[in-house]
């Protein structure tokens, strides 16, 4: 195998490991990782809300079904949506108090899972790893 093949295969195995560990945290709460990601985006937006298209653009994993994803979260009363007053073609999204409470339950176990997933890397190695992954992402964005 080439070095590039080995590198990509290792990256994919590491991503799968991280995804499985994070799924184990959110699934007992009735969430997918994509739904969790939406809730985090909306929590960060605060009271201003976020247009649907911006939520889609800020997702870690891009999804063509952002409307269905938001529908499910709205059915669970974790988010609310409202037509934008300035541009009636857009909908703004907010996290609800119920959504915030759910994230608060998940935050500590999620952070612990991140630490456990990265336990083989020292802090300076983590920083270098983050820079390398950022460069890889930027080259293809």
Q: Where are the model-predicted features located?
A:
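N-terminal leader segment of winged-helix/HTH proteins
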Residues: 1-29, 76
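Short alpha-helical elements of helix-turn-helix
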Residues: 5-9, 32-40, 67
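Charged, amphipathic alpha-helical coiled-coil/dimerization segments
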Residues: 71-131
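Short amphipathic alpha-helical elements of helix-turn-helix/winged-helix folds
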Residues: 17, 41-45, 58, 132, ...
